[in-house]
């Protein structure tokens, strides 16, 4: 299987050498690194080429690497039911540079790109309707970025008196925290209930 994927990677690299930066096979899947501005051309080739026939776009997501100048890996997962193979195509971008939309190549990319924008803030140029899809339209920030606070910025709740959803600053009430003072990880030398049975 890995040999056929490596051959496919060589075929893709040989045909699209100006658009593809490289490839490797890992965990039974072919991983291709492409130029961001050529992503539509690369995916169209993968869909239409007789040796590829990746007719199904399964997902688009991103990975956040805040320490890199090109902070985001935008990842496209494709499936070829004709070849019984999967491929992962990755492009790199930053917060300001838009990745070309691939809705014209795979119509299912519409909501995938919206989700990636909503969760990571990755921009897609020429998208027909790039707006939030999972969070509220007034949501502040991008929740899957590594620099997004775990508690969020605001708390959303329904106010029965006002009969509407209200936004409030996050309040963390300490008295509801459950601290385990009997934890063996604290270096204590006492016996926990039930430990006495283990000594017999």
UniProtKB/Swiss-Prot annotation:
It is found in: Cell inner membrane. The keyword Cell inner membrane applies. Keywords: Cell inner membrane, Cell membrane, Membrane, NAD, Quinone, Translocase, Transport, Ubiquinone. It is a peripheral membrane protein. Its EC number is 7.1.1.-. Its main location: membrane. It comes from the Bacteria. One of its GO terms (molecular function) is NADH dehydrogenase (ubiquinone) activity. The keyword Nucleus does not apply. It catalyses: a quinone + NADH + 5 H(+)(in) = a quinol + NAD(+) + 4 H(+)(out). InterPro entries: NADH_DH_suC, NADH_quin_OxRdtase_su_C/D-like, NADH_UbQ_OxRdtase_30kDa_su, NADH_UbQ_OxRdtase_CS. GO terms for cellular component: plasma membrane. NDH-1 shuttles electrons from NADH, via FMN and iron-sulfur (Fe-S) centers, to quinones in the respiratory chain. The immediate electron acceptor for the enzyme in this species is believed to be ubiquinone. Couples the redox reaction to proton translocation (for every two electrons transferred, four hydrogen ions are translocated across the cytoplasmic membrane), and thus conserves the redox energy in a proton gradient. NDH-1 is composed of 14 different subunits. Subunits NuoB, C, D, E, F, and G constitute the peripheral sector of the complex. Belongs to the complex I 30 kDa subunit family. This is NADH-quinone oxidoreductase subunit C.
